[in-house]
Amino acid sequence: MSTFEDADTEETVTCLQMTIYHPGQQSGIFKSIRFCSKEKFPSIEVVKFGRNSNMCQYTFQDKQVSRIQFVLQPFKQFNSSVLSFEIKNMSKKTSLMVDNQELGYLNKMDLPYKCMLRFGEYQFLLQKEDGESVESFETQFIMSSRPLLQENNWPTQNPIPEDGMYSSYFTHRSSPSEMDENEL
């Protein structure tokens, strides 16, 4: 029988908290995601998000989502003792926006501690809480009842169109403009 003094010291675990929103979320898009509870993964595992339940740990019940939409991979920065994450867009048809950085197919970047992730009408607010362990990490999902862009005072942006590309017409305008119907 082990004693208190002989017990292993328990390390804290890095947690990636994801608050998510979609205007059609009441239709069951997120029904396969367990909200509020934390889920633990080994740090060697790549976490996949998409609509294919055979390949992805987190699935969306939405035909507009790619089989694998994006992946999160933990890693350790050089000279760092904590886990970081990189995100890679796996969709050929839809760009992924991380804050104001657009990621095309197979583009990847390091995730900041707090960022807004968007594709289509999906909005994710990702926040990382550092832990001591480099052997594992946790994810936690929270569903927002309101759009995250307005709730967190992020700059309003247009949804990413289905073809995955932003039109310069939409990205260069800073405010709505009126147009006479004869100008169309």
Curated annotation (Swiss-Prot):
One of its GO terms (cellular component) is cytoplasm. Highly expressed in the spleen and at lower levels in heart, brain, lung, liver, kidney and testes. PROSITE patterns: FHA_DOMAIN. It is found in: Cytoplasm. Residues 152-184 are annotated as: Disordered. Its main location: cytoplasm. Pfam families: FHA. Residues 47-103 form the FHA domain. It comes from the Eukaryota. The keyword Hydrolase does not apply. Phosphorylated at Thr-9 following detection of ADP-D-glycero-beta-D-manno-heptose (ADP-Heptose) by ALPK1. Phosphorylation at Thr-9 by ALPK1 leads to the formation of an intermolecular binding between the FHA domain and phosphorylated Thr-9, promoting TIFA oligomerization and TIFA-mediated NF-kappa-B activation. The modification Phosphothreonine is found at residue 9. GO terms for biological process: cytoplasmic pattern recognition receptor signaling pathway; innate immune response; positive regulation of canonical NF-kappaB signal transduction; protein homooligomerization; tumor necrosis factor-mediated signaling pathway. Residues 168-177 have a biased composition (Polar residues). Keywords: Cytoplasm, Immunity, Innate immunity, Phosphoprotein. Adapter molecule that plays a key role in the activation of pro-inflammatory NF-kappa-B signaling following detection of bacterial pathogen-associated molecular pattern metabolites (PAMPs). Promotes activation of an innate immune response by inducing the oligomerization and polyubiquitination of TRAF6, which leads to the activation of TAK1 and IKK through a proteasome-independent mechanism. Homooligomer; homooligomerizes following phosphorylation at Thr-9. Interacts with IRAK1, TRAF2 and TRAF6. Interacts with TIFAB; binding to TIFAB inhibits TRAF6 activation, possibly by inducing a conformational change in TIFA. Interacts with ZCCHC11; binding to ZCCHC11 suppresses the TRAF6-dependent activation of NF-kappa-B. The FHA domain recognizes and binds phosphorylated Thr-9, promoting homooligomerization and subsequent activation of NF-kappa-B. Belongs to the TIFA family. This is TRAF-interacting protein with FHA domain-containing protein A. It comes from Mus musculus. The gene is Tifa.
